[in-house]
């Protein structure tokens, strides 16, 4: 099929059975028709969307991150439990994420924009051996902002709770929130900030192992050179792997496409 950006604001309309559009959902899936773009994307049978915010969220699928590190470093030491880490990240971000979408639904981005939200749910310096510390710092920021928003908008609290129930039906929960946060932010300000130091440690481990097993300097240098040539940048692996095809959201998208193909 043809992949293109759906220009909802233009005169282009996708109604031709010979052409479908595949687009990032952004917040449009969660807005559930609160904007013209959202209505167009979720109601047009010729438009398929990612469900996750964007393709980058799939590339950062937690269950795939260990394999990404293995492919990049050729070291399979499970240094960090990525699934548990991203679950904890999601649980911390979740309540503020609900507020972020609420402001979008109210068309009030001057008070709390997407950029504002992302500034609260980023990681600062990450310790490979104590990654939870970066989450503790983020948690403090999020709690302060939540208290501020709750004081400013006490009448919104019932709506916020209703949105949580609504989002659960849409597949969003406290454990997978990272799949619905801006994709570039998750990749650049969360996952890469974790993967880069992890891969650096894994590479040093493998180089130390090569040195310890080498019987002489020439063997060490030859094997070290060979190892260095076979390494890949973790950013490259992250963008090229396809392990996200096992994710529930991807399976949901696959099912949509299969249903569509049966009726053309």
Locations of the language-model features?
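Acidic side chains
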Residues: 2, 24-26, 56
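Single conserved hydrophobic/aromatic residue that forms the stacking wall/gate
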Residues: 2-13
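Generic hydrophobic, helix-prone segments enriched in Leu/Val/Ile
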Residues: 5, 53, 92-96, 250-261
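Acidic beta-strand-to-loop metal/phosphate-binding motif
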Residues: 15-30
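Switch/connector loops and helix/strand junctions flanking conserved nucleotide-binding motifs
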Residues: 28-33, 57-59
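Short, aromatic/basic amphipathic alpha-helical patches
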Residues: 31-41
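Activity-critical C-terminal alpha-helical subdomain
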Residues: 41-219
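Charge-dense, extended regions
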Residues: 196-264
